[in-house]
């Protein structure tokens, strides 16, 4: 190690954040050439990163940024292997640089991000260098970057635990209502963060998905009814359908006639049918759209007023503000959603590292 000064080792460490012994070894390997030592460590770091890449990164953060004029917003999920690293200052700096790069280069996908420049090198190279320094696999898993056209705003909400983030876009016509629309979007984003709707509208469901979910829903209600019957409690109605997308005009017309026939058989005067049938139809629709109420943003009951669905809240605001509001964008990221984290004991971990 002769000829390798402590000052040179320190300089290399400052440039790379690598360990002291790694810096010494790198300088010895390249005969004291600083640039070659940096390259040596980078290559070594990338090699380490590749070995770490088969370990699932299921911790991390969901971060978002909304433009001051509410005309654009971005949200990103960045995964690490442990919660400890997610709180590391180096990891926080990585999150900041990721958002800055997305904004600077108008990025919409992780593929675009990895190829985009950051400090005169591809972002992917920067990411790998951080994996080597931090010592864990890090993955930029998901990105959404929304832009609002005229008469639209975008607002969002990030939970304080940095594990859930939501963006909501709303179209409006009356410019004077913009501040109220901004606030409404944030409140709806907070609702979505808590209630986890899967999609904006039932139109986003496939018919196969709805039919499958409806069968499961019916089985669930039948089981609940068995217990309710045993306890002498009222039974729930068994639905025929699960979503509004199944309630065609023909289905609704058929049901309306069935209610009218029922009233006729009961001897109810026809002149009062119009006062009874709408309520029955409303109940029929409610009983046969339970999937929408559980899984769609517009169909869920608002956490701040559980007598109204989100769709009804938006409609009421439109009427009150003399406007025509419509939710046009809905993005929700939850940390690690869909990832199954491996359970490994310490002995297995050591054995894996020795391979």
From Swiss-Prot:
Question: Which portions of the sequence form the region Involved in Mg(2+) ion dislocation from EF-Tu?
Answer: 82-85
Main location group: cytoplasm
Q: Which InterPro entries has this protein been placed in?
A: EF-Ts_dimer_sf, Transl_elong_EFTs/EF1B, Transl_elong_EFTs/EF1B_dimer, Transl_elong_Ts_CS, UBA-like_sf
Give the top-rank taxon of the lineage listed in the UniProt record for this protein: Bacteria
Location(s), subcellular: Cytoplasm
The record, for PROSITE patterns, names:
EF_TS_1 (PS01126), EF_TS_2 (PS01127)
- Gene Ontology terms, MF aspect: translation elongation factor activity
**Keywords, sorted A to Z:** Cytoplasm, Elongation factor, Protein biosynthesis
Q: Does the keyword rRNA-binding apply?
A: no
SUPFAM superfamilies, alphabetized: Elongation factor Ts (EF-Ts), dimerisation domain (SSF54713), UBA-like (SSF46934)
Give the matching CDD domains. UBA_EF-Ts (cd14275)
Q: Name one GO cellular component term.
A: cytoplasm
On whether Cytoplasm is a keyword of this UniProt record, the answer is yes
- Report the record's Gene Ontology biological process terms: translational elongation
The function of this protein is: Associates with the EF-Tu.GDP complex and induces the exchange of GDP to GTP. It remains bound to the aminoacyl-tRNA.EF-Tu.GTP complex up to the GTP hydrolysis stage on the ribosome.
Please name the NCBIfam families in this protein's record: tsf (TIGR00116)
Would you identify the family this protein belongs to, as annotated? Belongs to the EF-Ts family.
- Please report the name of this protein according to its UniProt entry: Elongation factor Ts
What organism does the UniProt record list as the source? Answer: Helicobacter pylori (strain ATCC 700392 / 26695)
